[in-house]
Amino acid sequence: QNQSSAASDVYKRQPLSEDLVRHMVLNSLRSYKTKFSKDFGELVLCYDDKHCWRKDYFPYYKQNRKKARSESSLDWNELFDILTKIQNELEENFPYKVLKINGAEADDIIAILSNKISSTPNLYEEILIISGDKDFIQLHQSDNVKQYSPTLKKFVVDENPEQYKFEHIIRGDKGDGVPNVLSQDTVFVEDLRQRPITKKKLIEWKENGIPEGEIKRNYQRNKTLIDFDSIPNELGELIYNMWVDKITQNDKSKILPYFMKHRLKELTEKLGDF
């Protein structure tokens, strides 16, 4: 255990290798495509925009992540620059739809497309979300939506996605800086303790509704930030239209020159997987 954490610390202090990151990203995409394209069709890559509508609505959204990154020995700005460069290369050289929308997170794109495809008969098909993020469990309410965690290497399953969403809104999301409904907006940025929510309260609120006043206000705050049904309508339309307008090119002629340019010999031998 100590050896592995020491090794990761040494790795973190070294400059990031663009070539290594590129190989890891491409090899992951190759793996997902070979594993899942037969059952789930084309690969659609969704990216976060730097600007996010949730941040406009709630200034403390994901605020703690900045703090964690500034304290990390990994150069996050360099990593983001490399990933942005690779994103542009994918759009230029590979036959996949690459989607990024001003003001939207990747989650918004995934949610809007999943809901649209699930609710439109002539679009309806099986969807696989490749992410371990439990925010997506609420989308499992549609039978055609499945989720696979690349970290755990297994499907994410929940018995009751509707109940999961309700509890998620009530409890908030510490990782995203969203407090529970009994806690004030600034609870995480001020390093305060949240007021705990009992199982009894959850059952009571589910049966009788959310009480008026501060709790109702906080519930609305969390619903706006967590419930994908709260994504602004205009943003949803932009996302859907961009997806429709992006034509998937079946042209793979740029992949080999791209691999050769970046000396991706190992992947050149697996060209057919892309």
Where on the chain are the PLM-derived regions?
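Cofactor-binding loop segments of dinucleotide-utilizing enzymes, especially the Rossmann-like FAD-
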Residues: 1, 48, 132
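Phosphate/oxyanion-binding active-site loops and adjacent basic polyanion-contact surfaces
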Residues: 17-25, 102-107
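Extended two-metal-dependent nuclease catalytic cores across DNA- and RNA-processing enzymes
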Residues: 39-40, 66-274
